[in-house]
């Protein structure tokens, strides 16, 4: 009998230990990881102003440069955003400006002003994955894609460059220029560290890398990034030389009026 009581007591202790042991948090879903990454990468702060240098490098190592100012504002909790980009140089693109009205769940509205023609051109939704001013980034890369346009699955967890990362596979729901994308997303800062794009034959197409990440105030920011076309060997490097958050931008800056006449206070 004493032995029986002892066995019962040990069983109760074991049961209590199991119940009281801290539960290990489940990993977030692939969709939740990508959602948080889009928020960290494209929505940090209420607004931003950034001085940006872009280098377009061909396979022979020849370089073309672009200098621009980027403005962005978030419009409340709806997820709507406005982007404005003004090109300071070189001469062939000086005065060109680019405007995006972004809406979660549907196609963004995009316009570009070409000063040589004094023309504001609307960019068709089908062109959102075409090259942004001759670079290896697309218009969609600049302002972000819709979460619902792809399915997302967590593949594994691993370190990349000393940072803990989730590896997520995303597949477009419709036929587009790539068949799938692998993303390495920092599991603490939620910024994308690397992305690999594959074409319809599952051959490597483009690779994005976050080359320099810094903390600006409260925000972690990818200050240098690059995109390489693996099939043409052309690559684009982008460096944010200055990044300011929460400077008090007004929504009326992001209109056609300022495509033609840049808001000097903000793009000087």
Annotate each language-model stretch with its function.
Residues 13-16, 20:
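Residue-level signal for alpha-helical transmembrane segments in multi-pass membrane proteins
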Residues 1-12:
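Bacterial N-terminal signal peptides that target proteins for export
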Residues 35, 88, 99-101, 109-113, ...:
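Gly/Pro-enriched, hydrophobic low-complexity segments
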Residues 144-150, 157:
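Surface-exposed beta-loop interaction hotspot
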Residues 257-267:
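Short, low-complexity, Pro/Ser/Thr/Gly-rich segments in the mature regions of secreted, periplasmic
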Residues 21-26:
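Sec/Tat signal peptide C-region and signal peptidase I cleavage site
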Residues 74-81, 156-164, 215-217:
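Short, ordered beta-strand-loop transition motifs
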Residues 29-116, 153:
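N-terminal mature ectodomain segment of secretory-pathway/periplasmic proteins
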